[in-house]
Amino acid sequence: MTKKLFAALVAGCSFLAAAQAEVTVTEPWVRGTVPSQRASGAFMGLKSSSDVRLVGASSPAAKIVEVHEMSTSDGVMRMRAIEGLPLPAGKTVELKPGGHHVMLIDLVKPLLPGEQVPISLTFVGADGRKSTVEVKAMVRDLTSRGSSAHKH
């Protein structure tokens, strides 16, 4: 009886683990700021093992943290907060300058190159379950435009 109960418990735990999406974060970074600057963006690659949505974020570096998108309309770039960013299973979604990103608003202090900014990313799966991924994003120079791996 005990062996059957244990086997059922292990099978149940395996099912729950399989149902939880695994999100991989690659090259997280934040653009550095000047002393009077009150906001910055965080950028990274996100890949999930199952369909999820990035629905929020938080960081001790900023009082407000939002998921944003950039779009161009009639030659004018516009930025706005969005309720969620879909991550299709197995596909990498890039958060990058000029596109989707995590916006850090009302910064607690300037972000200096070489520092690390902790960011908590919140995801929701198709089943409604929330999960959080903790990230440490490296602060890059104010003029940085993207991947440090990019070479000419």
Regions found by a protein language model. Name each.
Residues 1-5:
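Positively charged n-region of N-terminal signal peptides that target proteins for export
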Residues 7-17:
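Bacterial N-terminal signal peptides
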